[in-house]
Amino acid sequence: MTYDHNLASAGVVRAAPPPLVAISILNWDGWQDTLECLESVRRLDYPNYLTVVVDNGSCDNSAERIKAWAHANLGAAHVLADYTQEIALQGGDPRSEEALQRTASLARLVLIRAKENLGFTGGNNLSISYALRRAFAPDYVFLLNNDACLEADCLTQLVDADRQADAAMIGASLSRLGVRRVENRSESGKTRVPNAASTREEFNGFIKEGGRRPPDLENRQISESLKKPSARLDADDDLIPVAWASGGALLLRRDLLEGVKQIQGDYLDDRFFVYGDEAALSLAASKLGHKPMLAKRAIGYHRGMTSTGGHWGALQFYYSTRNTFYGADYLPKFERLRFRLVYPLKSTGRILKYLLKGRPSSARAAFWGMIDAYRGVTGKWRDHDREAELGRRGFLETSRAEVS
């Protein structure tokens, strides 16, 4: 509780305002999901938040549709700050920031237009950089997938959990969209947290196959490196430790973000682009002494993988194969060395399995993921097979000549 010095002498105590939370939502050619997510945010009962939407280089006029929604739904006194990437990285426009600060949470929105698709890592790094460089920097950043919807008290539960347990990194309890909870349990009476976080045994690092969790040796190594007891998802505790927390609905305290940036140069490891980055962030947080936690009472619903068509394809197999290699950098030295020895064998086995199952596109993606890992290729996926085809036709050389 803080004091107003002008009132303190009169014996009047003024309660501190609730911590400010910047809600970071990424949009990439998915304005329908984003608008549904924004409607969910408007129903939150938490009183002090700033919604930040990063349009990640969309080609479907998403930014204009989001602006139109804001003008139609946020009320006559709303404030919409429409920033370029450059202005956002400066902490926004001072006059707009003042107006945002004076406006109620329900009636303020920041739209940042990225020059290109920066991925999950780059888009959120842009949003976090803007938020923490504002004159009115938030106490927390809440990463929220644009295909997620929240119960009204979700953000309140997350902030309260951190203030009670000093956790710094807390994931919401997410069910697949369409599976509603009843008093934190599904209709069958069993707790459902399939998309929220992972226990030590379930932690699979960065590789999933069609929603399954294969028994990968290298991922067990990542899990075991945490040296934490297993979390029981049916435990009575409202807040439970997990090996990693999903970025689908993840509350991050400012001091944690600043500490991670000091270690690795940015808030999220931008080598990943997408997939596996939140697991790496969880490992980085653990090194700083912060245990990733799951707040069972902070409930949300997540459709999942809408930006990639709703199912696992070549993109996912490429990123999961490549990013597993980079994720090993967060392991202790001995386990990292052991991982490097196992990685090519496991990756080659996975490629052969896809070929035997008649999935050549998945095999090619996993192959290039492994090759690019050793070549140090980071960021957005490059379709090497397509580039080779264009090169054979002479198109690639022509385009390069035109650029130069």
Model-derived regions, located:
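Short, flexible, basic/aromatic active-site loop/helix in glycosyltransferases
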Residues: 193, 199-242, 255
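Short, acidic, metal-binding catalytic loop of nucleotide-sugar glycosyltransferases
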Residues: 39-48, 72
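Active-site-adjacent helix/loop segment of glycosyltransferases
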Residues: 4, 24, 283, 287-368, ...
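N-proximal low-complexity "stem/linker" segments adjacent to membrane-targeting elements
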Residues: 1-43, 94-102
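Conserved donor NDP-sugar-binding/catalytic core segment of glycosyltransferases
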Residues: 148-208
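Short beta-strand-to-loop acidic/aromatic patch adjacent to the donor-nucleotide binding site
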Residues: 136-149
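A short, conserved alpha-helix in the catalytic core of glycosyltransferases
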Residues: 243-261, 266-299
